[in-house]
Amino acid sequence: MTADHNKNATDNLLLLSSTLQGLTSEGINARSERLDEMSALEIAQLMNSEDQTVAHAVEKVLPAVAKAIDAAHDGLAKGGRIIYVGAGTSGRLGVLDASEIPPTFSASTSLFHAIIAGGQAAIFEAQEGIEDDRAQGVVDLDAANVTEIDVVIGLAVSGRTPYVLAALEEAQKRNAITIGISCNPGSELEQQADIAITPEVGPEVLSGSTRLKSGTAQKMVLNMISTGAMVRLGKCYQNRMVDLNITNEKLRARALNLVRELTEADKEAALHALVEANWNVKVAIVICKTGLDAAAAFDLIQSAGGHLRQALNEAK
């Protein structure tokens, strides 16, 4: 048994070694082969130059990103959630994006949920071994009580992380929409996900360190999906964050400036409207633009599904 086990482990390791060699993200970057001889400025210049290619790689997959935005919006509109699943750097990027949504859009903390292999401890300290645990991926996905109105986003630069693949497979059994974000074309994740987003950024400056260009590409895509979905839910007006969660003096000042900019009201009128609206920026804007009281302004916004532009159009 021991000999057979060792042979299987060796065979699996050799297979994985061959698989990694074939991944674009694991390749050798010819431009950085002198990396250990470079000056600080040369390293910065090279990394900056390489990073400039990331936006072009993401540009090529924008149609898929648009599908993901639509799927995320539709899921949220039905009362579902966006659930990120990842390991290592990819998992931490999911945690970061999910944590930024509530303060940016005054959204419930339940709308965006991040699952990272290894749990909360993995946010601060590497738990890399857990990424190979398919069973744990299923368990963690199950614990999130995923349903058919949720959207599950699998993050894995390699496109082969067992934990993530198993979680997405379980999500699909529950009829949830799945999105896969990787940086290697033709990967298992790309083939498995309902919507595949695969920006091909090429080999890293530091070979295999996918927290660099690959991580940047993932962050850019996540920015687009979450921001696009929330914008389409009515969380902004023009290009302003009008669904601020106002919790401090800086945000009160920002809210006051927003109301003044968008309504041309003077400072006193804008402040009065915000106080009447209990610091709800949308309600204050409707008050200033229409003369309605706070209750009527709130009802108008609610009837417009939270979309300020639609509410103002209906008030004309």
Regions found by a protein language model. Give the residues of each.
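Cofactor-/ligand-binding subdomain signature composed of acidic, glycine-rich
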Residues: 2-57
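Gly-rich Lys/Arg/Thr-decorated short loops/hinges at beta-loop-alpha junctions or inter-strand turns
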Residues: 25-26, 46-54, 114-125, 237, ...
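Short, amphipathic alpha-helical interaction segments embedded in low-complexity terminal/linker regions
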Residues: 229-316
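Short, basic, glycine/proline-bearing loop/turn elements
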Residues: 50-60, 126, 151-154
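A short, well-structured juxtamembrane/interface segment
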Residues: 60-75
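Glycine-rich phosphate-binding loops that contact phosphosugars or nucleotide phosphates
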Residues: 83-221, 229-231
